[in-house]
Amino acid sequence: MNTNQRIITIGTICLIVGIISLLLQIGNIISLWISHSIQTREKSHPEVCNQSIITYENNTWVNQTYVNISNANIVAEQGVTSIILAGNSSLCPISGWAIYSKDNSIRIGSKGDIFVIREPFISCSHLECRTFFLTQGALLNDRHSNGTVKDRSPYRTLMSCPIGEAPSPYNSRFESVAWSASACHDGMGWLTIGISGPDNGAVAVLKYNGIITDTIKSWRNKILRTQESECVCINGSCFTIMTDGPSNGQASYKIFKMEKGRIIKSIELDAPNYHYEECSCYPDTGKVVCVCRDNWHASNRPWVSFDQNLDYQIGYICSGVFGDNPRSNDGKGNCGPVLSNGANGVKGFSFRYGNGVWIGRTKSISSRSGFEMIWDPNGWTETDSSFSMKQDIIALTDWSGYSGSFVQHPELTGMDCIRPCFWVELIRGQPKENTIWTSGSSISFCGVNSGTANWSWPDGADLPFTIDK
């Protein structure tokens, strides 16, 4: 092969290689264009589930799932479903109470950023249960916790966090400015009721899904107050009870019916010689049953039951097993107020089962210490003091406090009945202990028809804290 032939051959090979390279580049461009077109078309269609991109810089826990993080992770968000909580079922048959949650907030608060709180309560939607609480605008073991024994101040707010978690600035959601409160879920949204303002002119602010929907002005100008536990929702309507008037004499009591946070009906109870405060309410077969605190003159607890039209009945728990604190020793009951040692009181609850009643109460008859659940099979209608079952919750030597009811609807549990539950506040600090603050943790139990335990689940914090010394 002469020189010219070699030149022609090399040129031909280079031309062929160049053409192949050009074709590969064109193919690459076409491939990228097709891929981009497919992605663009996919983004133009509605997505089955929303996604959010979360970028982390270290290994961490997110929503109780361990994530090994070195780059961006795409997390699919669960769709939120809305239903109407019917509230038409009866209470589940139970034989005892299983522990459900314990937040240990005072123990954790000795070293962590934990709110100073009182009046915690629990309420459940069809998706979750949350702990609601009234903060003092202060943290434990901090100087602003000084003097938080005071009930009503402009710094108090209603907040909530997932049940069982210690309430802190990092896991809590603001709900309302309030020194008295209630909250409940109708299946579509959270209703919150927060009362704040001066004693002689307080206002209840109603919010639905965080938006103000209505207000209630104090009608007696004597410390308007509400349940300090969950309100009740049935078939899209929610119900609560409020009190206005003396804490040691005849006051005024009103039931309110609300839909999506707006008041559609209210009535005042005709209840002479009755005293209703801090009612613990629950749904049962389409009606509302409330068991309350008589701070005026009774050792037993008053109740009110009403339907969705607010037609009501009133009474006192007849049992000689008395539920208030302070109270008389168990003895002869009364279907009206038991007047012996009945002044003052504490928020509490009971669950009615026909003629029988589960009574939650402190173990002490004079101080807020200890807690027990007692089953009196005839206690709703009979006045004797016999009972058939007792379950220990808090030992007599440990502090308790307020207690109240909440329920889990069939839409949450998958059961065909409404599960009864209760919470107990474990108050620590002033006025019984040598601290500058008053706060509390909480435990909760739910009714089961299987084995349960007798024990004590106290707060357990070692006091005083550093700030107290």
UniProtKB/Swiss-Prot annotation:
Residues 11-33 are annotated as: Involved in apical transport and lipid raft association. Keywords: Calcium, Disulfide bond, Glycoprotein, Glycosidase, Host cell membrane, Host membrane, Hydrolase, Membrane, Metal-binding, Signal-anchor, Transmembrane, Transmembrane helix, Virion. Inhibited by the neuraminidase inhibitors zanamivir (Relenza) and oseltamivir (Tamiflu). These drugs interfere with the release of progeny virus from infected cells and are effective against all influenza strains. Resistance to neuraminidase inhibitors is quite rare. Residues 91-469 are annotated as: Head of neuraminidase. Ca(2+) binds at D294, D324, N344. It is found in: Virion membrane; Host apical cell membrane. Glycans are attached at N50, N58, N63, N68, N88, N146, N235, N454. N-glycosylated. It comes from the Viruses. Residues 28-469 are virion surface. Residues 1-6 are intravirion. It is a single-pass type II membrane protein. GO terms for biological process: carbohydrate metabolic process; viral budding from plasma membrane. Its cofactor is Ca(2+). Its EC number is 3.2.1.18. The chain crosses the membrane at residues 7-27. It holds the Pfam family Neur. Disulfide bonds join C92-C417, C124-C129, C184-C231, C233-C238, C279-C292, C281-C290, C318-C335, C421-C446. Signal peptide: none annotated. Residues 36-90 are annotated as: Hypervariable stalk region. Intact N-terminus is essential for virion morphogenesis. Possesses two apical sorting signals, one in the ectodomain, which is likely to be a glycan, and the other in the transmembrane domain. The transmembrane domain also plays a role in lipid raft association. Belongs to the glycosyl hydrolase 34 family. Catalyzes the removal of terminal sialic acid residues from viral and cellular glycoconjugates. Cleaves off the terminal sialic acids on the glycosylated HA during virus budding to facilitate virus release. Additionally helps virus spread through the circulation by further removing sialic acids from the cell surface. These cleavages prevent self-aggregation and ensure the efficient spread of the progeny virus from cell to cell. Otherwise, infection would be limited to one round of replication. The influenza A genome consist of 8 RNA segments. Genetic variation of hemagglutinin and/or neuraminidase genes results in the emergence of new influenza strains. The mechanism of variation can be the result of point mutations or the result of genetic reassortment between segments of two different strains. Homotetramer. This is Neuraminidase. It comes from Influenza A virus (strain A/Swine/Wisconsin/1/1961 H1N1). The gene is NA.
